Amino acid sequence: MLIFDSGVGGLSILKNIKKILPNIHYIYMLDNESFPYGNKTEFFIIQRSIKIIHTIKKIYPINIVVIACNTISTVALSILREKFDIPIFGIFPHIKAAEKITKNKIIGLIATKATINSSYTQKIIYEYSCSNTIKIIGTNKLAVIAEKKIRGVAVSQKKLKNIFRPWINLPTCPDTIILGCTHFSLLEKEIKNILYKTRSVYFIDSIKKVIFQIKSCLKTSNVNQKIKKNIFLYSKNNNNLKKLLSFLKQYKFTVIKHINLN
């Protein structure tokens, strides 16, 4: 199984996969050279995704791909499925689930600008805005804050307040928030403290849904596990990567190495 993202957000998916499928082996591709995907063009996102899968597929016998990134999923998933002959799973903003949960009919969606602007997201926003008020924040800054948190940098309350100011100033805030980026679940506590100090809020991500799909695929198809160890690949060696290494110990990678994607 290959799981890839431009940052560590995808590790939240990997963590949940490990809970449900503890015996599975995996490759995690950290495309930190391209971080963040959220400020890249659709052309770049599509070409980069093809390059990652093609390059790793030539070296390792991967049989499932998990795109641990809302931006790539909303922009490129259909193209990737056409191009490769293995199951490919993506993660998407789960507005349908939010509609079932919201009490005040005000739903918040926070995602990267590329995810918000994608035709997929625009379509579902239009579909569900008929019966709900959907408040949107498109930002590439929150993923950067989450990455820094993983490396031990304190989360700036001032920066968070600036990002969420459009919602802070609302007479009634969303009671249900869709986390449209795998990084954002790392900041749930901080987001709640900024917006809802005395009230409850329900956060929605799509991790459970994609894990259910993966589990079903493994049960119902002839997908056999061919990778025999856990591998961590990265596209750029820098100081941020070095600070991340201690955090990676919990995932029990037996191989950590650079891979050239250029």
Swiss-Prot record:
Organism domain of life: Bacteria
Function: Provides the (R)-glutamate required for cell wall biosynthesis.
A Pfam match: Asp_Glu_race
Pathway(s): Cell wall biogenesis; peptidoglycan biosynthesis
Active-site residue numbers: C69 (proton donor/acceptor), C181 (proton donor/acceptor)
Family as reported in the entry's similarity comment: Belongs to the aspartate/glutamate racemases family.
InterPro entries recorded: Asp/Glu/hydantoin_racemase, Asp/Glu_race, Asp/Glu_racemase_AS_2, Glu_race
Gene3D superfamilies listed in its UniProt record: 3.40.50.1860
NCBIfam families: glut_race
Enzyme Commission numbers on file: 5.1.1.3
Keyword Lipid biosynthesis: no
Any one biological process term the GO annotation gives: cell wall organization
Protein name: Glutamate racemase
Keywords of the record: Cell shape, Cell wall biogenesis/degradation, Isomerase, Peptidoglycan synthesis
